[in-house]
Regions:
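Short coil turns that delineate tetratricopeptide repeat
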Residues: 57, 91-94, 128
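TPR alpha-solenoid repeat register
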Residues: 62, 96-99, 133
Length: 136
Protein backbone atom coordinates (compact mmCIF):
# COMPACT_ATOMS: atom_id res chain seq x y z
CA UNK A 1 0.00 0.00 0.00
CA UNK A 2 2.79 2.45 0.89
CA UNK A 3 4.55 1.58 -2.36
CA UNK A 4 1.51 2.58 -4.48
CA UNK A 5 1.09 5.79 -2.48
CA UNK A 6 4.79 6.59 -3.03
CA UNK A 7 4.44 6.08 -6.81
CA UNK A 8 1.35 8.30 -7.00
CA UNK A 9 3.05 11.10 -5.06
CA UNK A 10 6.21 10.82 -7.18
CA UNK A 11 4.25 10.97 -10.45
CA UNK A 12 2.28 13.97 -9.18
CA UNK A 13 5.48 15.85 -8.35
CA UNK A 14 6.96 15.03 -11.74
CA UNK A 15 3.86 16.30 -13.52
CA UNK A 16 3.79 19.54 -11.54
CA UNK A 17 7.53 20.05 -11.99
CA UNK A 18 7.23 19.37 -15.71
CA UNK A 19 4.66 22.10 -16.22
CA UNK A 20 6.89 24.63 -14.47
CA UNK A 21 9.77 23.74 -16.77
CA UNK A 22 7.55 24.37 -19.81
CA UNK A 23 6.18 27.68 -18.50
CA UNK A 24 7.65 30.68 -20.29
CA UNK A 25 8.64 33.94 -18.66
CA UNK A 26 8.12 37.34 -20.21
CA UNK A 27 11.88 37.51 -20.85
CA UNK A 28 11.74 34.26 -22.85
CA UNK A 29 8.87 35.58 -24.98
CA UNK A 30 10.85 38.78 -25.61
CA UNK A 31 13.88 36.77 -26.74
CA UNK A 32 11.73 34.76 -29.13
CA UNK A 33 10.19 37.97 -30.43
CA UNK A 34 13.64 39.48 -30.94
CA UNK A 35 14.71 36.46 -33.00
CA UNK A 36 11.59 36.78 -35.15
CA UNK A 37 12.14 40.54 -35.50
CA UNK A 38 15.74 40.05 -36.65
CA UNK A 39 14.43 37.58 -39.25
CA UNK A 40 11.96 40.26 -40.39
CA UNK A 41 9.00 38.13 -39.32
CA UNK A 42 7.11 41.12 -37.96
CA UNK A 43 3.79 39.37 -37.27
CA UNK A 44 5.50 36.53 -35.41
CA UNK A 45 7.51 39.05 -33.39
CA UNK A 46 4.29 40.92 -32.57
CA UNK A 47 2.73 37.70 -31.29
CA UNK A 48 5.71 36.90 -29.07
CA UNK A 49 5.81 40.41 -27.62
CA UNK A 50 2.08 40.28 -26.91
CA UNK A 51 2.65 37.01 -25.03
CA UNK A 52 5.38 38.71 -22.99
CA UNK A 53 3.03 41.57 -22.16
CA UNK A 54 0.33 39.09 -21.18
CA UNK A 55 2.84 37.61 -18.70
CA UNK A 56 3.93 41.02 -17.41
CA UNK A 57 1.89 44.09 -18.35
CA UNK A 58 4.49 46.39 -16.76
CA UNK A 59 7.48 45.30 -18.88
CA UNK A 60 8.48 48.41 -20.85
CA UNK A 61 10.89 46.48 -23.08
CA UNK A 62 8.15 44.16 -24.29
CA UNK A 63 5.85 47.11 -24.91
CA UNK A 64 8.54 49.07 -26.77
CA UNK A 65 9.45 46.04 -28.88
CA UNK A 66 5.78 45.50 -29.70
CA UNK A 67 5.67 49.09 -30.90
CA UNK A 68 8.66 48.44 -33.15
CA UNK A 69 7.03 45.30 -34.60
CA UNK A 70 3.82 47.23 -35.24
CA UNK A 71 5.75 50.08 -36.84
CA UNK A 72 7.50 47.61 -39.15
CA UNK A 73 4.04 46.41 -40.24
CA UNK A 74 2.96 50.02 -40.84
CA UNK A 75 0.44 49.91 -38.00
CA UNK A 76 1.44 53.39 -36.94
CA UNK A 77 -1.46 54.31 -34.67
CA UNK A 78 -1.09 51.09 -32.68
CA UNK A 79 2.67 51.60 -32.51
CA UNK A 80 2.20 55.12 -31.13
CA UNK A 81 0.09 53.77 -28.28
CA UNK A 82 2.74 51.19 -27.41
CA UNK A 83 5.59 53.71 -27.56
CA UNK A 84 3.62 56.05 -25.30
CA UNK A 85 2.97 53.26 -22.81
CA UNK A 86 6.62 52.19 -22.88
CA UNK A 87 7.79 55.76 -22.28
CA UNK A 88 5.52 56.06 -19.24
CA UNK A 89 6.69 52.77 -17.73
CA UNK A 90 10.39 53.01 -18.58
CA UNK A 91 12.62 54.13 -15.72
CA UNK A 92 15.82 54.16 -17.81
CA UNK A 93 16.00 57.55 -19.54
CA UNK A 94 18.06 56.26 -22.46
CA UNK A 95 15.49 53.59 -23.30
CA UNK A 96 12.69 56.11 -22.74
CA UNK A 97 14.34 58.38 -25.32
CA UNK A 98 14.01 55.58 -27.91
CA UNK A 99 10.25 55.54 -27.43
CA UNK A 100 10.02 59.31 -27.91
CA UNK A 101 12.33 59.12 -30.92
CA UNK A 102 10.12 56.50 -32.59
CA UNK A 103 7.03 58.56 -31.83
CA UNK A 104 8.76 61.43 -33.62
CA UNK A 105 9.50 59.17 -36.59
CA UNK A 106 5.83 58.19 -36.86
CA UNK A 107 4.72 61.82 -36.73
CA UNK A 108 7.34 62.79 -39.31
CA UNK A 109 6.14 60.00 -41.63
CA UNK A 110 2.62 61.41 -41.32
CA UNK A 111 3.92 64.92 -42.08
CA UNK A 112 2.95 66.13 -38.61
CA UNK A 113 6.20 68.04 -38.31
CA UNK A 114 5.36 70.18 -35.27
CA UNK A 115 4.37 67.11 -33.29
CA UNK A 116 7.44 65.22 -34.52
CA UNK A 117 9.70 68.03 -33.33
CA UNK A 118 8.11 67.90 -29.87
CA UNK A 119 8.74 64.17 -29.59
CA UNK A 120 12.31 64.60 -30.79
CA UNK A 121 12.82 67.31 -28.16
CA UNK A 122 11.50 64.95 -25.49
CA UNK A 123 13.92 62.28 -26.70
CA UNK A 124 16.83 64.71 -26.59
CA UNK A 125 15.91 65.79 -23.06
CA UNK A 126 16.29 62.16 -22.03
CA UNK A 127 19.44 61.56 -24.08
CA UNK A 128 21.17 64.75 -25.30
CA UNK A 129 23.96 62.69 -26.91
CA UNK A 130 21.62 60.95 -29.40
CA UNK A 131 22.92 62.19 -32.75
CA UNK A 132 20.25 60.37 -34.78
CA UNK A 133 17.47 62.20 -32.95
CA UNK A 134 19.33 65.50 -33.20
CA UNK A 135 19.67 65.04 -36.96
CA UNK A 136 15.93 64.42 -37.41
Amino acid sequence: MNYIHYIIVTVAFLLVGGTNAVAQTDRNWIRQGNRAFKSQKWAAAETQYRKAIYKNQKNPQAIYNLGCALLAQQKDSLAMVQFGNAAQLESNIFRRSKSYHNMGVVMQNHREYAQAIEYYKMALRCNPQDNETRYN
